[in-house]
Regions:
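Short beta-strand/loop motif that positions the catalytic acidic residue
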Residues: 162-168
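Active-site catalytic motif of lipid deacylating hydrolases and related acyltransferases
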Residues: 1-59, 190
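Short alpha-helix in the alpha/beta-hydrolase fold that links the catalytic acid
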Residues: 29-30, 158, 169-181
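Flexible "cap/lid" loop of the alpha/beta hydrolase fold
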Residues: 80-111, 133-138, 144-149
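Hydrolases whose catalytic domains are alpha/beta-hydrolase-1, hotdog thioesterase
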Residues: 27, 73-77
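Catalytic histidine-centered segment of alpha/beta-hydrolase-like enzymes
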Residues: 170, 185-203
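Gly/Ala-rich beta-loop-alpha elbow adjacent to hydrolase catalytic centers
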Residues: 64-74
């Protein structure tokens, strides 16, 4: 796993963002941090990361925002948050009932190609928006797909805010509804960040 500080200005509050598969900061770089520091974790080829999590203890308030596969991965780290938001993901993200159906996921790995990756990114949106320019290596993204099959969420972790898009073509909306037991509350595709201008809107 990798990390990157998106805003590090010595604020008393920090937003911890667990990104989705294959992504970098391009999907959320437009969000204003306001009076919060922001750190992003991404690239789940391994869960080992060269980061001292005790650094986060200096913040008086820690907020979690996780998206897609990051919803599961965030639960695997022992961090106490003031609030936690799950966006278009579940704790069973590769699952016939609660996530991406297993057969579809395996077929995605088997047939993964640069063209397939580009189609995936396009399918994250349900409207004509400028697609993010993700600067991740193809082979790294491909191996990350396989690595994610090896992880299981900490089911004791509790999210207190759930955001579900009504037209998610990646993790089917109906499967998210089945997992969380709430109706969709965002009018978008899998990547909803273009609906927002500030991180605080996601807390």
């Amino acid at each position: 796993m990798k990390y990157r500080w998106l805003n590090e200005k010595g604020n008393s509050k920090v937003i911890v963002f667990f990104n989705g598969w294959g992504m970098d900061e391009s999907v959320i770089s437009h969000l204003e941090p306001e009076n919060c520091d922001v750190i992003m974790f991404y690239d789940y080829n391994t869960l080992d990361v060269d980061f001292d999590f005790s650094v986060l203890n200096k913040y008086s308030q820690k907020y979690l925002v996780s998206w897609s596969m990051g919803v599961m991965c965030a639960t695997l780290f022992d961090i106490e948050y003031k609030s936690s938001t799950a966006i278009n993901g579940t704790l069973s993200p590769i699952d016939d009932k609660f996530g991406i159906p297993k057969r579809i996921y395996d077929l995605t790995i088997r047939g993964f190609s640069p063209a397939g990756r580009d189609k995936f990114i396009k399918n994250m949106f349900d409207t004509e928006v400028e697609l993010p320019s993700v600067k991740r290596e193809f082979e790294e993204q491909k191996s990350e797909l396989s690595a994610l099959k090896n992880y299981s969420a900490n089911t004791d972790f509790k999210y207190n805010k759930i955001l579900i898009s009504n037209n998610d073509k990646i993790i089917p909306t109906k499967n998210q509804v089945a997992f969380w037991g709430i109706e969709p509350n965002l009018d978008s595709g899998h990547c909803p960040f273009y609906l927002f201008t500030k991180w605080s809107e996601l807390l």
